[in-house]
């Protein structure tokens, strides 16, 4: 078995895919209407956005984590684009920030 990618459910896959493409510095791959993919480099899990008419309550049991060399600057950049900070976290060996994208999906930025 191999990883195919990470699918994010959304009411508007075109808008959310465009936001993530800009956030990650990648291009939109394919737009099939109900499914939009990103062109991702080999070191990034393929991302796709799937249209659901009704988004289930209690979602976000799984979320992506992204590494960054400058946690504060990257957090500021994403907030300026429409992300929301949920919580800043510091553990003995790791520093990270939990955010939501404009659609309310959780993700973490982790200091390298």
Regions picked out by a protein language model, each given a short descriptive name:
Residues 11, 16:
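Hydrophobic ligand-binding cavity/cleft-lining segments
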Residues 33, 42-44, 57-61:
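Short connector loops at helix/strand junctions that flank enzyme active sites
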Residues 1-10, 22, 27-30, 37-39, 54-77, 95-100, ...:
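Vicinal oxygen chelate
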């Amino acid at each position: 078995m191999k990883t195919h990618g990470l699918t994010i459910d959304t009411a508007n896959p075109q808008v959310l895919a465009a936001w993530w493409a800009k956030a990650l510095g990648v291009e939109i791959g394919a737009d099939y209407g109900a499914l939009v993919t990103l062109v991702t480099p080999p070191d990034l899990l393929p991302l796709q956005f799937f249209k659901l008419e009704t988004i289930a309550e209690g979602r976000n049991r799984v979320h992506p984590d992204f590494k960054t060399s400058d946690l504060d600057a990257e957090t500021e950049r994403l907030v300026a684009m429409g992300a929301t900070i949920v919580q800043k976290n510091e553990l003995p060996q790791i520093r990270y920030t939990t955010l939501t994208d404009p659609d309310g999906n959780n993700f973490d930025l982790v200091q390298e």
